[in-house]
């Protein structure tokens, strides 16, 4: 039978006045889709070596689609690697893109990178041979699985489904791979088998970007006795599994734009057991976890969970720029922090999972910096503040206005003198108001309790009207109520 190969490509107002929202503000949280990275500082060979399988191919294709400078090199690397798989359709697609990219380079001689070469010819013999090999292997695995089912040996059937899933994955048919891995669930005879099945389903679901499926199977794996019942010290194998689950959950939370939850997941990963090249590298954990924490954690959380974390420190050693950004932010050196963020932005935009969130994360980090900068002061000179944040006074005023309207800064702006004043809060009046409100609530509850006690003491009860079709008898609930009042 022919092998069906389906190719999936991974991708309350403070001010009493009303202000019309700038349409650009509504788009601020929209993911960047069409952008071009012109000045990357990425070592492509080292970057690609951090991943394996379909993830390496997809990440290289993502870079090729968004960075003209690295397009030819990325496609050549992807073409070379895809020939180690049965993924014929992706091979042909990458070769077509490489031919187009090479023609573009030849038409713009000034942009030709050093060492540029003509793309290799389409290897039709490899294509035909690989299709035949894939078909033969599929038929063999299918026959083996039928024999296992005939013998009714659960362990063999489970392995047969896993082998079929591995083959479909190698061919790029993610839909059938997911079906095979999922079918293995009925033949799992131990917690270890269930965890292995969950990890396989999670891996394919990440490739398909089916994030709800990812979280569902992470939860299933974490609820197995082998993971759930262990407390305190875990053995190396269990810790490795838990790290994979936390990394996958972190990716799903990141995709759902739940950045604080994503940060917490990545921070729970163990550096010594982080070996998941099919999805992400330890460097990714450092970048994803660091930026999400920076955008959502307050100073205490940042110090306790990131800076003082002995495990996450090891991840940050792999990404010294991210580490320095976090320390600069914590030390309130915001100009240096924001400048360093701009320096790494191009590389972040080449990450297929982080790229859609770069603009939002950067905005949240900048807003948090503005809030922290102003929090100790009664008033702040906006000229000095603009210098500290490397921006103009008018742009800063717009940012502060938005923060005030969102209730993130309790302040008012003297637009003439360019001074930001903290709003005076009368703590005495506020405390009195809270006390009075609490007193009114206690009074209401006390009256309700007195009324209930009086009703019970006088044996007052209300008989519910008979329902349609009934003979007017008391319901069990009413009977019980009547008994309790007569006792």
Swiss-Prot record:
Respond yes or no to whether keyword Nucleus is given for this record.
yes
For this UniProt entry, what's an example GO CC term? Answer: cytoplasm
The PCI domain is annotated at: 265-427
Query: In the UniProt record, does the keyword Transmembrane occur?
Result: no
Residues of the region (Disordered) are 103-123, 461-487
Parts of the chain that traverse the membrane: none
In terms of Gene3D superfamilies, this protein maps to:
1.25.40.570
| UniProt subcellular location | Cytoplasm; Nucleus
Q: Where do Polar residues bias regions lie?
A: 472-487
| Coarse class of the protein's main subcellular location | cytoplasm
Record's function text = Essential component of the COP9 signalosome complex (CSN), a complex involved in various cellular and developmental processes. The CSN complex is an essential regulator of the ubiquitin (Ubl) conjugation pathway by mediating the deneddylation of the cullin subunits of E3 ligase complexes, leading to modify the Ubl ligase activity.
Assembly information from the UniProt record = Component of the CSN complex, probably composed of cops1, cops2, cops3, cops4, cops5, cops6, cops7, cops8 and cops9.
What name does this protein carry? COP9 signalosome complex subunit 1
Lineage at the top is: Eukaryota, Metazoa, Chordata, Craniata, Vertebrata
